A protein has these predicted regions:
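Nuclease catalytic cores that cleave nucleic-acid phosphodiester bonds
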Residues: 62-187
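Domain-level signal for Mg2+-assisted phosphodiester chemistry and nucleotide/NA-binding surfaces
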Residues: 1-89, 128, 132
Length: 187
């Protein structure tokens, strides 16, 4: 990718937090167990994704977490606090509309931090238009709909194992390839 290319990082904060809490930890994450979002941007910068515009989608239907919003702004994320009075999944709808707008434009690649299969049609459309599309999350919890897009060129990056976005090792069990197996981690 060239420096002129723009890559949009879209973070589905609700999905990442819910997956971390319910599927990985089995409880609400403590603040020191949450991703270090600055490391995500550092990883992207070090891996030639061109110019990055980072959007962090938040459900602000009940309230807006101002301390977190201020932290996001300090890390060069643009918070997108969405609200609705209906039963809509506000963050999902906001991200879907954003993906559709990017697909309708002449350029723009996407990195999506989410496990949610609801974004499959929009990501497929981007891939079919030749855009670079990457999903960040916990690989073992990625929806089948998104996983199937790897046949179309979707790249998957693990939030913990590849980006190293956490200060603590998470209690995850996953398949270990022999070339990465380190017996000392089990002794």
């Amino acid at each position: 990718m060239s420096d002129e290319d723009i890559t949009y990082l879209l973070v589905d904060g609700e999905n990442i937090d819910a997956t971390l809490g319910m599927s990985v930890l089995g409880r609400r994450p403590q603040s020191d167990e949450r991703p270090r979002w600055d490391r995500v941007l550092s990883y992207i910068a070090q891996n030639n994704y061109g110019k990055v515009k980072a959007l962090f989608f938040l459900n602000a239907s009940d309230h807006i977490p101002m301390a977190f919003v201020q932290a996001l702004l300090a890390m060069d994320y643009r918070p997108v606090p969405l609200a609705s009075t209906g039963d809509e999944k506000v963050v999902d709808v906001g991200i879907q509309r954003t993906l559709e707008t990017i697909a309708d434009s002449d350029s723009g690649n996407v990195i999506l931090a989410s496990h949610d299969g609801d974004f499959e049609p929009q990501l497929r459309s981007l891939l079919e238009k030749g855009r670079t599309v990457t999903v960040i999350g916990f690989e073992e919890f990625l929806s089948n709909e998104l996983r199937q897009l790897t046949d179309y060129g979707l790249k998957i990056i693990d939030l913990e194992r590849e980006i190293k976005a956490f200060n603590t090792q998470l209690p995850r069990i996953g398949i270990i390839t022999l070339d990465t197996f380190d017996p000392t981690k089990f002794l």
